Amino acid sequence: MTAPVVVGPGSGTSTMQFIMPKQFKRISDLPTPTDSRVSIREVPEAVYLVHQFSGNMGRGDGHDAIAERERMVAVEKVASEGGAFSEYVSADSKFLVARYDPPWTLPFLRTNELWFPVPLSPTEATAKLPTA
């Protein structure tokens, strides 16, 4: 199993993404899925604003009451801190849920994240970061 497992809404169903290890340089290096519901695709480089939290997550696409509560925590935190990326996180922002631990991990030891997409290139995002 790889970590994180990223879940989010899809077209009519939810999607689950596995981040492949660095040893796989090309899609052709990956094993061919044996289940027709599984597809392999390359996802372009992207920038996300990340909110990390611990606890138990629901099943499915991760967009449940826990994720919604954590989204509001992230929105309040970003709003109170201001900063260069506050315009990208709001109460209606879309997000992905990243889970890092196996199901048997105790909830208080689990690492979860909400990933809010930021429509900037990595270079543009880096330029917006505050300097020390």
What are the residue ranges of the model-derived segments?
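A solvent-exposed interaction/effector surface
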Residues: M1-A132
